[in-house]
Amino acid sequence: MPHADLKYSNDLTLNASTILTSIEMVIQTHDPGSGNCKGRAYPTAEFHHTHLLVEISMLPKAHRDTAFMAALSADLETTIKAYLSQPCSFSLMISFSSENYITNRFEP
């Protein structure tokens, strides 16, 4: 279950929900067994320079090798930038969760 966080200056006009849905679709295209991508958006009114930082974390898997990550990064960058209409600094970071990370679903 990947996670995607959008951290951005609130002077950007963007539809965070649409971008998060698109991120999930790109990840699932590259890795159909990845599951749902949990997403959050954090616009901030206090910032220095207009920017968008996209942080994606995934569990390490054998098939998520260098070639996989390069293709995923390129497709994510292209997809996300298609939703931007203003100049801004853009950063994309894809990282792997540590072996101590626990993820599951809680049902009371």
Label for each model-derived stretch:
Residues 1-17:
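N-terminal presequence-like segments and adjacent domain-start helices
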Residues 1-5, 31-59, 94-95:
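Short edge beta-strands and adjacent turn/loop segments
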Residues 101-108:
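Short, low-order "capping/linker" segments at domain edges
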Residues 75-101:
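C-terminal structural segments of small proteins and small subunits
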Residues 60-62, 80:
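Short amphipathic alpha-helical interaction patches enriched in hydrophobic/aromatic residues
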Residues 19-30, 69-84:
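Short, non-transmembrane amphipathic alpha-helical segments
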Residues 13-18, 63-68:
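Short, conserved charged micro-motifs
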